[in-house]
Amino acid sequence: MKINLDRTSSGFCIGVQGTIHVAEEKLAQSGELYCLGDVVHNEVEVKRLEALGMETIDIPAFEELRNAEVLIRAHGEPPSTYETARKNNLAITDTTCPVVAKLQRTAKMLHQLGYQVVIYGKKVHPEVIGINGQCDDEGVVIKHPDLSDPEEIAPLDLSRKTALISQTTMDVPGFYELKRNLEKLFAEHGHRNPGTQSGEWMAVRDIDITAEKTGALAMPKLVFKDTICRQVSSRNGKLRDFALANDCIVFAAGRKSSNGQVLYSICKDANPHSYFIEDVDEIRPEWFVGENGKPVESVGICGATSTPMWLLEKVANYIDKTFGDGSSNPNA
C-alpha cells in the first residue's frame, strides 16, 4: 500500500503561515500570548500552541483584559476590536492576512460610497464579522447562492445601488451563481445597470472604486468584485486530481474550517472513498480494504489551508506503520 502525501495543494496558506510564525516567535520570546479566538480553525494546532503558552480568549474575556498583548489572527477583526484594545491599553499584534486586509478596505470604501454591500459567506465566520464591521454591520450576508433562505435575502433593498463581494475562502462557482441570481432578482424588480438588457452587474477593480471615491469616474449602480483568494481556490483542481489518483483519501482538517469543508467536498465528489478526520484517533482500518477484500494500492493524505503539514505527516506515518508495511516513506 503506497502512501501519497499531498504537499502542493494542502497545508497552511500564506496568511495562516504568517500568523503561526508570529505566534511561535512571540511565545519563544515571552512564553505567553493571548489570541482572540482560535488562532486557526484546527483544534490540533490550537492545542499545540496553547501548550507553548498561548491562551485563547473570546470577546467577553477580551473586553475585560487590560495591559496585555493580544494576537489578531489571519481572519481579521472589525474596527470595534481595535477600539476596545485602545481603551484597555492592549498591545495588538496584528497578523490579519494581507488578502483579507485588502478586502476589508474594499468593503469599507464601497460602504462609504453608499453601496449596499452583499457578502457571499457565512454570517458567524470571523472573517465575515470583520468585513461586515467595515460596513458598520450593515452588510447583507448570504451563504446560499440559490437565494433559498428567506431570512438571508429579507434585508436586501432592491432599490439601492449594490455591490457583491465574497469571504475569501468561499467557492468560486457559488459566488458566480449568487451573482447571476442577484442579477435576475434585481432585474425582475426593474433595477438594472443602464445599457444592459439582461441586468448584468459590472465587474469592478480597486482602481474603479478609487476613481469613484475621488470623483474621477462614476461606477454603475450594480457591481461585483470577486474577492475569493486565488491561492485557496487554485488548490481545488489540484486536489480533485489528487483524489482521483488515489484509491482512498484521508482528509485532515478542523471541523470549524470553512475551507476544509469546501475542499473535503471536492475530494468526496471526485472519490467516494474519502474520509474526514481531525486527528489519527479517528482513522478506521476498513477504509483501507478494497472491494476485493485486499488492501487498497494507494492512500492519499491531504488537508485544508488551516491544516499544518506536521499533522499531515503524522497521519501519513501513522497509516503507513499501522496499516501498511512501513516502507512508503511519506515524508520524502
Swiss-Prot record:
<keyword id="KW-0408">Iron</keyword>
<keyword id="KW-0004">4Fe-4S</keyword>
<dbReference type="GO" id="GO:0019288">
    <property type="term" value="P:isopentenyl diphosphate biosynthetic process, methylerythritol 4-phosphate pathway"/>
</dbReference>
<feature type="binding site">
    <location>
        <position position="41"/>
    </location>
    <ligand>
        <name>dimethylallyl diphosphate</name>
    </ligand>
</feature>
<feature type="binding site">
    <location>
        <position position="257"/>
    </location>
    <ligand>
        <name>isopentenyl diphosphate</name>
    </ligand>
</feature>
<feature type="binding site">
    <location>
        <position position="259"/>
    </location>
    <ligand>
        <name>dimethylallyl diphosphate</name>
    </ligand>
</feature>
<feature type="binding site">
    <location>
        <position position="306"/>
    </location>
    <ligand>
        <name>isopentenyl diphosphate</name>
    </ligand>
</feature>
<dbReference type="InterPro" id="IPR003451">
    <property type="entry name" value="LytB/IspH"/>
</dbReference>
<feature type="binding site">
    <location>
        <position position="13"/>
    </location>
    <ligand>
        <name>[4Fe-4S] cluster</name>
    </ligand>
</feature>
<dbReference type="Pfam" id="PF02401">
    <property type="entry name" value="LYTB"/>
</dbReference>
<feature type="binding site">
    <location>
        <position position="168"/>
    </location>
    <ligand>
        <name>(2E)-4-hydroxy-3-methylbut-2-enyl diphosphate</name>
    </ligand>
</feature>
<comment type="function">
    <text>Catalyzes the conversion of 1-hydroxy-2-methyl-2-(E)-butenyl 4-diphosphate (HMBPP) into a mixture of isopentenyl diphosphate (IPP) and dimethylallyl diphosphate (DMAPP). Acts in the terminal step of the DOXP/MEP pathway for isoprenoid precursor biosynthesis.</text>
</comment>
<dbReference type="GO" id="GO:0016114">
    <property type="term" value="P:terpenoid biosynthetic process"/>
</dbReference>
<feature type="binding site">
    <location>
        <position position="41"/>
    </location>
    <ligand>
        <name>isopentenyl diphosphate</name>
    </ligand>
</feature>
<feature type="binding site">
    <location>
        <position position="125"/>
    </location>
    <ligand>
        <name>(2E)-4-hydroxy-3-methylbut-2-enyl diphosphate</name>
    </ligand>
</feature>
<dbReference type="GO" id="GO:0046872">
    <property type="term" value="F:metal ion binding"/>
</dbReference>
<comment type="pathway">
    <text>Isoprenoid biosynthesis; isopentenyl diphosphate biosynthesis via DXP pathway; isopentenyl diphosphate from 1-deoxy-D-xylulose 5-phosphate: step 6/6.</text>
</comment>
<feature type="binding site">
    <location>
        <position position="258"/>
    </location>
    <ligand>
        <name>isopentenyl diphosphate</name>
    </ligand>
</feature>
<keyword id="KW-0411">Iron-sulfur</keyword>
<feature type="binding site">
    <location>
        <position position="257"/>
    </location>
    <ligand>
        <name>(2E)-4-hydroxy-3-methylbut-2-enyl diphosphate</name>
    </ligand>
</feature>
<dbReference type="GO" id="GO:0050992">
    <property type="term" value="P:dimethylallyl diphosphate biosynthetic process"/>
</dbReference>
<feature type="binding site">
    <location>
        <position position="75"/>
    </location>
    <ligand>
        <name>isopentenyl diphosphate</name>
    </ligand>
</feature>
<feature type="binding site">
    <location>
        <position position="41"/>
    </location>
    <ligand>
        <name>(2E)-4-hydroxy-3-methylbut-2-enyl diphosphate</name>
    </ligand>
</feature>
<dbReference type="GO" id="GO:0051745">
    <property type="term" value="F:4-hydroxy-3-methylbut-2-enyl diphosphate reductase activity"/>
</dbReference>
<keyword id="KW-0560">Oxidoreductase</keyword>
<feature type="active site" description="Proton donor">
    <location>
        <position position="127"/>
    </location>
</feature>
<feature type="binding site">
    <location>
        <position position="258"/>
    </location>
    <ligand>
        <name>dimethylallyl diphosphate</name>
    </ligand>
</feature>
<feature type="binding site">
    <location>
        <position position="259"/>
    </location>
    <ligand>
        <name>isopentenyl diphosphate</name>
    </ligand>
</feature>
<protein>
    <recommendedName>
        <fullName>4-hydroxy-3-methylbut-2-enyl diphosphate reductase</fullName>
        <ecNumber>1.17.7.4</ecNumber>
    </recommendedName>
</protein>
<feature type="binding site">
    <location>
        <position position="229"/>
    </location>
    <ligand>
        <name>[4Fe-4S] cluster</name>
    </ligand>
</feature>
<feature type="binding site">
    <location>
        <position position="306"/>
    </location>
    <ligand>
        <name>(2E)-4-hydroxy-3-methylbut-2-enyl diphosphate</name>
    </ligand>
</feature>
<comment type="pathway">
    <text>Isoprenoid biosynthesis; dimethylallyl diphosphate biosynthesis; dimethylallyl diphosphate from (2E)-4-hydroxy-3-methylbutenyl diphosphate: step 1/1.</text>
</comment>
<feature type="binding site">
    <location>
        <position position="257"/>
    </location>
    <ligand>
        <name>dimethylallyl diphosphate</name>
    </ligand>
</feature>
<keyword id="KW-0479">Metal-binding</keyword>
<feature type="binding site">
    <location>
        <position position="125"/>
    </location>
    <ligand>
        <name>isopentenyl diphosphate</name>
    </ligand>
</feature>
<feature type="binding site">
    <location>
        <position position="125"/>
    </location>
    <ligand>
        <name>dimethylallyl diphosphate</name>
    </ligand>
</feature>
<feature type="binding site">
    <location>
        <position position="306"/>
    </location>
    <ligand>
        <name>dimethylallyl diphosphate</name>
    </ligand>
</feature>
<dbReference type="GO" id="GO:0051539">
    <property type="term" value="F:4 iron, 4 sulfur cluster binding"/>
</dbReference>
<feature type="binding site">
    <location>
        <position position="258"/>
    </location>
    <ligand>
        <name>(2E)-4-hydroxy-3-methylbut-2-enyl diphosphate</name>
    </ligand>
</feature>
<comment type="similarity">
    <text>Belongs to the IspH family.</text>
</comment>
<feature type="binding site">
    <location>
        <position position="259"/>
    </location>
    <ligand>
        <name>(2E)-4-hydroxy-3-methylbut-2-enyl diphosphate</name>
    </ligand>
</feature>
<feature type="binding site">
    <location>
        <position position="97"/>
    </location>
    <ligand>
        <name>[4Fe-4S] cluster</name>
    </ligand>
</feature>
